[in-house]
Regions:
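A conserved mid-protein helix/loop that constitutes part of the nucleotide-sugar donor-binding site
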Residues: 1-5, 149-172, 185-192, 272
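A conserved nucleotide-sugar
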Residues: 11-15, 163, 167-204, 283-288
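Short hydrophobic beta-strand element within catalytic cores of glycosyltransferases
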Residues: 17, 244-247, 257
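Short His-centered aromatic/hydrophobic patch
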Residues: 44-48, 65-72, 86-87
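Acidic anion/phosphate-binding donor-loop and adjacent secondary structure
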Residues: 47, 113, 119, 128-143
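Aromatic "clamp/platform" in nucleotide-sugar-dependent glycosyltransferases that forms part
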Residues: 208, 227
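Conserved acidic donor-binding segment of nucleotide-sugar-dependent glycosyltransferases
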Residues: 259-260, 264-271, 280-286
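A short, well-ordered alpha-helix in the C-terminal region of glycosyltransferases
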Residues: 273, 280, 287-302, 308-314
Length: 329
């Protein structure tokens, strides 16, 4: 949705195709972006490819940008440039029809090139955060005192996100309260862990949220303890919303964050180090202000919407022109 909105704001005619999702279709409708629904099912889905052919025949796109494997594998070839966009270490067999690939992190570029793609067909364009003005959410509405140190964590409740490490750190840091915004298969396990460690009264599981800005603005810091993270959207979101960041040296954050300058970086799975990083930020207002200032500067210099969208548009125009020449020839 973030890219769709940004493209539309730059005058691009956008048409989205997606699985049925009430949240996403509502957002598309509110943004005035037309869309179609299809299944993107498994191997027995014989309907989606024909559906996509009908949609492209009607819409006549210059460029098709696909996200993840299934959309790329189902997309029929046409006189448009077909670009796959990778935000993870997906199987490259699904992207064989693509003219080029966009990766949001340098390590994904390495992965794709080592997987056999020509380096001149693989491009690095990072993500940008969607920054919104918001009133900080009332802590009391989420059963949280106003005067306690509060850490915010966002993401799918999955082992890769290492939210168990954050909960263990909360048991070490005196009176630290934690908001966990996200949903996933680890929820029951994480709730049980918080009870076992005696911190369930200080850990709030918020489920999926659409009010990220209000959550960021209410928190004292953002903690992003991932074990495996190719890019790290939460990093740039924390920077964009002016929230001090504590993270780990997983692949994406270790590339993004300059330790001690725009975030605190700790080793993966090191509970004590994560707890120490949290305490350092909470106890040193001067450092916290420095992290916020430098994070905002990184957004302005490297990860602004204007700069990133311009990279997309320039590349799409280049590939569109190449594809048209091939089709005419």
């Amino acid at each position: 949705m973030t890219l769709n909105r940004a493209f539309k704001a730059r005058g691009v005619v956008v048409h989205s195709v997606l699985r049925d999702s009430p949240v996403h279709t509502r957002d598309l409708a509110q943004a005035g972006i037309p869309y179609d629904i299809t299944k993107f099912g498994g191997p027995l889905d014989l309907w989606t490819k024909g559906r996509l052919r009908k949609i492209t025949d009607k819409f006549r796109p210059d460029v098709v940008l696909t996200f993840a494997g299934r959309a790329s594998s189902y997309m029929p070839r046409g006189d448009y440039a077909l670009i796959g966009r990778l935000g993870g270490y997906y199987s490259l067999k699904y992207f064989k029809r693509c003219d080029a690939l966009i990766c949001n992190a340098p390590d994904l570029v390495r992965y794709v090139v080592e997987g056999g793609w020509a380096s001149d067909r693989v491009f690095h364009i990072p993500n940008f955060p969607r920054i919104e003005e918001a009133t900080p959410i009332d802590r009391v509405s989420l059963d949280t005192p106003e005067d306690v140190p509060l850490a915010l964590a966002l993401g799918r409740l999955h082992p890769n996100k290492a939210l168990d490490v954050l909960i263990k750190a909360a048991a070490i840091v005196p009176n630290l309260w934690v908001w966990i915004a996200g949903e996933g298969e680890e929820r029951q396990k994480l709730e049980n862990l918080s009870r076992d460690l005696g911190v369930s009264d200080r850990v709030r599981f918020l489920g999926w949220r659409t009010d990220k800005a209000a959550l960021f603005d209410a928190a004292d810091l953002c903690v992003y303890p991932s074990r495996k993270e190719p890019f790290g959207n939460v990093v740039v979101e924390a920077w964009g919303h002016g929230t001090p960041l504590v993270t780990t040296n997983s692949t994406g954050p270790s590339w993004l964050v300059r330790n001690g300058q725009d975030g605190i970086v700790t080793p993966i799975d090191d509970v004590d180090a994560l707890a120490k990083g949290i305490v350092t930020v909470l106890s040193n207002r001067e450092l916290a202000a420095k992290l916020v200032k430098n994070g905002r500067q990184r957004i302005s210099d490297e990860f602004s919407e204007e700069a990133i969208v311009s990279q997309y548009l320039d590349l799409m125009e280049k590939l569109r022109s190449e594809r048209k020449t091939q089709c005419v020839g």
